[in-house]
C-alpha cells in the first residue's frame, strides 16, 4: 500500500492541542461578551447557492470564492457572515422579532493568495443589530461598548476604538462638489494609513479626478489633529452648510456622548476622520479598532451602520449596524507578537487520577466525585510504570495528580499531589475535589492575552 504524506493546504490553519485551547478560550470570551448585550447565537450553512451568495454581483468577490458544481446545482462556500445573515433575515422575516440581535462565530473561505497572516479558511466573529424599517442611533453607540468589553476581557488594555461617520464625509464631499466621486474618494482615503497622505493626494487627483486644491482640502480635513472633543469642535465650524453633514455630526455627537455611560474609557476611544471603510454599503457610523503598540497589524475589529442589509433578497427595508473580528488573523498576529499568555491552563484535565490498585472501583468512584464537583478529571488506566504515568501528566501539563494505592483505598482516602510544587496531602475525595477546584479557579482567572 502506498502511503500518502499527511499535509495541510497552504492558507489553512491547524493548531496543536494547547494552542487550540487558547483559541477556544478566546471564542468563549467573545460568546460571553456578545450574550451579555442580548445577542442570540446564529449558525448558517457553510455551503450556499452561488446565486444567493453572489446576488449583489461578482467583481472581486466572485474571483475569490470557492465555487463548484454538484450535479446541476451551482454551489459556493460562504466568504463572509454578512451575506448569509442578509439571506437568513429575509427568509425568516415573519418569524423574527425586531430589532434582531445576533452573533455568529464561524469559518469563512476566500481563495486569496496565501501569505503570512492571511488565510483562505478563517474564523470571523460577527455581531449585528437589524431593525425593521428603522434602527435607533443608540445601537451605534452600544457597539463600542461591546468592543471595549470584549477586548478588556481578552486581556487587552492598549487599544483604540476609532469612530467616524460616513454622512460627515459624504456631506463634506458634497460641500466640495464631489458627491458623484464620493465612493471612489472614500476607498482612496481608506488607504491613508498604509500609503500616507502624499500618495493618497496623488491618487485622489489621478484616479478620482479631484483638483489639487480640493485634494489638499480633503487631506487637511481628515487629518484634523487633537482630541475627540477638539475634532467635534472642528466639525461644528462646518455646521449649517449641508444637511447630510449636520445629520452625521449629530450622530457622531450622540455616539460619543453616550460612551461614558456605557463604561468605555476615554483613552480607548477616538473620533478619527480618516476612518472611511471602503465598502459602499456603510451609511453612518463606522468603526475600526487598532492595538496601540502594534499599529502595523492594522484593524482587528471593524464595521459600521448600513441602511438596507437585504435589498437583494426582499423589498423590506432592514437597516442595521455590526462589527466583525477576524479571529484567526487576530490569534495569529497575537501569537507572532508573543502576546498569548503562557500562564493560561491549556491541559485537557485539571487532575490525573493514577490508580495503583488491581480493583479500580474506588479510583473510578473518586473520579466521579471529582467530576461532580466540576473538576476536569482523567483516569490513567494504561499498564505503565508509575514514573511513566507522571511523565504523561507532565507532558500534558496537568497540574494535579490523585494517587490511589491499596492503603488509600482501604481508608477511602486519596493522595493529592500538586505537580508544580511537589506537595502531597492525604484527604477524602470530597476534600480533594474542593481543594483542586479552588486552586483551579485561581489559575483559570488568567487572561488569554498578556500585554508586554
Where are these regions (language model features)?
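Acidic, His- and aromatic-enriched active-site or binding-groove loops in soluble protein domains
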Residues: 63-72, 178-200, 291-293
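Positively charged, Gly/Ser-enriched RNA/tRNA-binding surfaces
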Residues: 19-37, 48-49, 82-94, 102-157, ...
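Glycine-rich, mobile lid/loop segments that gate access to catalytic sites or pores
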Residues: 161-172
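Auxiliary tRNA-acceptor-end handling modules of aminoacyl-tRNA synthetases
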Residues: 1-19, 69, 179-182
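Polyanion/phosphate-binding surface patch
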Residues: 42, 46-75
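Short, solvent-exposed loop/edge-beta patches enriched in aromatic
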Residues: 33-42, 71-73, 94-97
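Short secondary-structure boundary/capping segments
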Residues: 58-59, 176-178
